[in-house]
Amino acid sequence: MGNPCHFALFDLQPSFRLDLEQLAARYRELARQVHPDRFADAGEREQRLALERSACLNEAYQVLKTPSQRARYLLALRGPELPLEVTVQDPDFLLQQMQLREELEELQDDADLAGVAAFKRRLKTAQEQLNDSFAACWDDDTRREEAERLMRRMQFLDKLSHEVRQLEERLDD
């Protein structure tokens, strides 16, 4: 069984802009249909296929619901697979990364929960701006380099957001 396009699994056209509530509802509907428990009395082959379909559906949902992963996937659909790790040749972005990490370290050192909350809001705004920028250029072949650069920035902000959530948990303890 080949892997169908993640978008096709959900009866969607490839697009960066998705209705996440609609995606979640469709996921729940499909998950019920392919859940391995529904095939408990079936033969071994059917059980294995149900497991594969369920795993494929779960992977597709995780990719489509996360903007940076959806961006990477869309770019891969339109061209060569992107390497997971790439040396970033963007000095402004590298400087921004260093500044954000330094700011987060200071917030951690100061155990500044209010500062962390403000930092998190700024990150969310930056992520929304990147999402808008990516949505405007991902399907334009003449702007592929820009789309790849934006996708890498999205991935960085995702990692940083994860670190912020971890810091919040540590400071809440």
Curated annotation (Swiss-Prot):
<dbReference type="InterPro" id="IPR036386">
    <property type="entry name" value="HscB_C_sf"/>
</dbReference>
<dbReference type="InterPro" id="IPR009073">
    <property type="entry name" value="HscB_oligo_C"/>
</dbReference>
<comment type="similarity">
    <text>Belongs to the HscB family.</text>
</comment>
<dbReference type="GO" id="GO:0051259">
    <property type="term" value="P:protein complex oligomerization"/>
</dbReference>
<dbReference type="InterPro" id="IPR004640">
    <property type="entry name" value="HscB"/>
</dbReference>
<dbReference type="GO" id="GO:0044571">
    <property type="term" value="P:[2Fe-2S] cluster assembly"/>
</dbReference>
<comment type="subunit">
    <text>Interacts with HscA and stimulates its ATPase activity.</text>
</comment>
<keyword id="KW-0143">Chaperone</keyword>
<protein>
    <recommendedName>
        <fullName>Co-chaperone protein HscB homolog</fullName>
    </recommendedName>
</protein>
<dbReference type="Pfam" id="PF00226">
    <property type="entry name" value="DnaJ"/>
</dbReference>
<dbReference type="GO" id="GO:0006457">
    <property type="term" value="P:protein folding"/>
</dbReference>
<dbReference type="InterPro" id="IPR001623">
    <property type="entry name" value="DnaJ_domain"/>
</dbReference>
<comment type="function">
    <text>Co-chaperone involved in the maturation of iron-sulfur cluster-containing proteins. Seems to help targeting proteins to be folded toward HscA.</text>
</comment>
<dbReference type="GO" id="GO:1990230">
    <property type="term" value="C:iron-sulfur cluster transfer complex"/>
</dbReference>
<dbReference type="GO" id="GO:0001671">
    <property type="term" value="F:ATPase activator activity"/>
</dbReference>
<dbReference type="InterPro" id="IPR036869">
    <property type="entry name" value="J_dom_sf"/>
</dbReference>
<dbReference type="Pfam" id="PF07743">
    <property type="entry name" value="HSCB_C"/>
</dbReference>
<feature type="domain" description="J">
    <location>
        <begin position="5"/>
        <end position="77"/>
    </location>
</feature>
<dbReference type="GO" id="GO:0051087">
    <property type="term" value="F:protein-folding chaperone binding"/>
</dbReference>
